């Protein structure tokens, strides 16, 4: 597993592990590193089958296998407790760890995640799969921003969109890996177990998310035993990239506050 450590390097520094979504790249969190670096040791990593970790996504195990990769990183860093922030699929990884190893996670942050995939999200993934299988990698990568960002933001960041597209094609994780990762997030379902998770959790959702209806975030906040809901009107699926200052402020307020488990 390829991972990087940023921010504080003191042995006693609080650690937060950041886990990205379907793309799997640790570089997704670039807009958060500086803001978190004054308070935390930050661990970012490339998911198995992606980026500098590479390799193949396991045929079995689903989200739990991806969570085991995080536990491997924690063991290598000798972490007995850490905070965890996950975007979409990364949030599912955090929920899995919170269920199986609750003693490890101090605080949990979920960004446009879910306890059970919404039918609308399934429709979006069907479209993306069809693009990949019928039109190829370039079409799949070209369509990806439509599910991540608001239209006005894409218009204002056209050069970035073009650069991201070139990078996405050049470093594509492979059709088999993408399909297995999509299958894992679609199969994830802990909806009837949410109340078992007592980890203090910040649930971040955006009303203009095209891929994941914000009602999935509402469901998480209602079902978890110690959750705070932070809804935004603007920012779409990748709200931490689109509105980093507002997002980072919410996250830091939550992480710095004393926990009150209800």
From Swiss-Prot:
EC class (word): hydrolase
EC number(s) per entry: 3.5.1.-
Keyword field: Hydrolase
SUPFAM superfamilies registered for this protein in UniProt: alpha/beta-Hydrolases (SSF53474)
A single BP term in Gene Ontology: uracil catabolic process
Disulfide bond residue pairs: none
Annotated GO MF terms: hydrolase activity, acting on carbon-nitrogen (but not peptide) bonds, in linear amides
Reactions it catalyzes: carbamate + 2 H(+) = NH4(+) + CO2
HAMAP family documented for this protein: RutD
Role this protein plays: Involved in pyrimidine catabolism. May facilitate the hydrolysis of carbamate, a reaction that can also occur spontaneously.
Protein name from the UniProt record: Putative carbamate hydrolase RutD
Origin organism lineage: Bacteria, Pseudomonadati, Pseudomonadota, Alphaproteobacteria, Hyphomicrobiales
Gene that produces this protein: rutD
